[in-house]
Amino acid sequence: MARLKEIYRNEIAPKLKNELQLVNVMEVPRITKITLNMGLGEAVGDKKVIENAVADLEKITGQKPVVTYARKSIAGFKIREGWPIGVKVTLRRDRMYEFLDRLLSISLPRVRDFRGLNAKSFDGRGNYSMGVKEQIIFPEIDYDKIDALRGLDITLTTTARTDDEGRALLRAFNFPFRN
């Protein structure tokens, strides 16, 4: 079992139950999935870009990403319907907790000029989104073998009903929030 999953079950869940004054353990907010998305606008003319992004995301997560395609043509962005424009991965269960552990303990401290995460990046329903400017903060990516620096979006979906519950959950996981 993943280290953070055990910590959640044994320490975080009972603490949050008391803190939020919940009756049932199943009411305690928990992280259901983590979605990583890499939007690749520059992939319009080059298939290699998609292949490299798929390889990078696969190294980071240990799971094969899905290529996302344009739903409709947009002349301003020079894309046509059905063209590949990004890659995404959804992590659940043990892989999700292992990725979260690596993100908090190894990757985020490697971000240049890191002052903490924005505590206001909640969506109103307890889900948290953050952006990473460079994929090289992950130790699985070899700096010498990358073709371009690419950013990615990380979304943590929780069962929290409000932003305050979600914030309490992520603070219990020791998320480094700014304020």
UniProtKB/Swiss-Prot annotation:
InterPro entries noted in UniProt: Ribosomal_uL5, Ribosomal_uL5_bac-type, Ribosomal_uL5_C, Ribosomal_uL5_CS, Ribosomal_uL5_dom_sf, Ribosomal_uL5_N
Record's keyword annotation contains NADP: no
Record flagged with keyword Translocase: no
Keywords carried by this UniProt record: Ribonucleoprotein, Ribosomal protein, RNA-binding, rRNA-binding, tRNA-binding
GO biological process, one term: translation
Database matches in Pfam families: Ribosomal_L5, Ribosomal_L5_C
GO cellular component: ribonucleoprotein complex; ribosome
Gene3D superfamilies referenced in this protein's UniProt entry, alphabetically: 3.30.1440.10
GO MF annotations in UniProt: rRNA binding; structural constituent of ribosome; tRNA binding
Assembly, per entry: Part of the 50S ribosomal subunit; part of the 5S rRNA/L5/L18/L25 subcomplex. Contacts the 5S rRNA and the P site tRNA. Forms a bridge to the 30S subunit in the 70S ribosome.
Family designation: Belongs to the universal ribosomal protein uL5 family.
Stated role: This is one of the proteins that bind and probably mediate the attachment of the 5S RNA into the large ribosomal subunit, where it forms part of the central protuberance. In the 70S ribosome it contacts protein S13 of the 30S subunit (bridge B1b), connecting the 2 subunits; this bridge is implicated in subunit movement. Contacts the P site tRNA; the 5S rRNA and some of its associated proteins might help stabilize positioning of ribosome-bound tRNAs.
NCBIfam families according to UniProt: PRK00010.1 (NF000585)
Protein name according to UniProt: Large ribosomal subunit protein uL5
Organism per entry: Azotobacter vinelandii (strain DJ / ATCC BAA-1303)
